[in-house]
From Swiss-Prot:
Homohexameric ring arranged as a trimer of dimers. This is Ribonuclease PH. Disulfide bonds: none annotated. One of its GO terms (molecular function) is 3'-5'-RNA exonuclease activity. PROSITE patterns: RIBONUCLEASE_PH. It comes from Geobacillus kaustophilus (strain HTA426). InterPro entries: ExoRNase_PH_dom1, ExoRNase_PH_dom2, ExoRNase_PH_dom2_sf, PNPase/RNase_PH_dom_sf, Ribosomal_Su5_D2-typ_SF, RNase_PH, RNase_PH_bac-type, RNase_PH_CS. Keywords: Nucleotidyltransferase, RNA-binding, rRNA processing, Transferase, tRNA processing, tRNA-binding.
Length: 257
């Protein structure tokens, strides 16, 4: 049975990543996953938080936000409330944690990469789209440092992407839930994986329901299918830099000789 938007159970929504979307940021993209659209930027700061000074390692941190009319009903800006919501804080930490998992922070050196993810239109999967887009923005920012001679090689070990999976009352296990599917799902799960197929994070909950080990395995298999396709889109967006993911510093030095 086809889903409401005509997709099969294990089919992603159309995904587009537009690189160099913002003029001033060292790295930036607009990522579109169906009707969900997120602007992701990466900013390089030549210092680290005070607790890391002198340690010889860099840091990656993230901020996440949503425009008031990214949703069907207007949301009040968090700046107007004077505090960041628990949901926003959780997503920010997830994005930063995910990106740090594939970066050699020692090779990055004592600098901070600020990731900003701003949702301009939301239709489910904003946190997973943010991770997938932020990864490309991060690579573009680090590529600029390599081009400028401030880094000898990309300090990135592997690709990284994220997607959602769930169990729908009618369709069973489905990939890449939109807002309406997420609202009715019996089980909702966000999965972050590397290009090598290793898991970075799995966030899964039953909504007034339980799920079996067999269903968990099926959910993770569907997520892996989707993430492999997302990484293919990332590769196209990165162009020649995609081939340099995971390169060693020594190899990069030989290429420049």
């Amino acid at each position: 049975m086809m889903r409401a938007d005509g997709r099969s159970s294990c089919e992603l929504r159309p995904v587009h990543i537009h690189p160099h979307y913002m003029k001033h940021a060292e790295g930036s993209v607009l990522i579109e996953v169906g009707d969900t659209k997120v602007i992701c930027t990466a900013t390089v700061e030549e210092k680290v938080p005070s607790f890391m000074r002198g340690g010889g390692k860099g840091w990656i941190t993230a901020e996440y936000g949503m425009l008031p009319r990214a949703t069907e009903q207007r949301n009040v800006r968090e700046a107007s409330k004077g505090k960041v919501s628990g949901r926003t804080m959780e997503i920010q930490r997830l994005i930063g944690r995910a990106l740090r998992s594939v970066v050699d922070l020692e090779q990055l050196g004592e600098r901070t990469i600020w990731i900003d993810c701003d949702v301009i239109q939301a239709d489910g999967g904003t946190r997973t789209a943010s991770i997938t887009g932020a990864y490309v923005a991060l690579v573009l920012a680090l590529a600029k440092l390599v081009e400028e001679g401030r880094l000898e090689a990309l300090p990135i070990r592997d690709f990284l992407a994220a997607t959602s999976v769930g169990i729908d009352p009618e369709h069973g296990v489905i990939l890449d839930l939109d807002y309406n599917e997420d609202a009715r799902a019996k089980v909702d799960m966000n999965v972050v994986m590397t290009g090598a197929g290793q898991f970075v994070e799995i966030q899964g909950t039953g909504e007034e329901a339980v799920f079996s080990r067999a269903e968990l395995d099926e959910l993770l298999e569907a997520a892996q299918i989707g993430i492999e396709q997302l990484i293919a889109v990332q590769r196209r967006a990165l162009g020649e830099w995609a081939a340099r993911i995971g390169e060693k510093k020594e190899a990069a030095e030989e290429d420049t000789e």
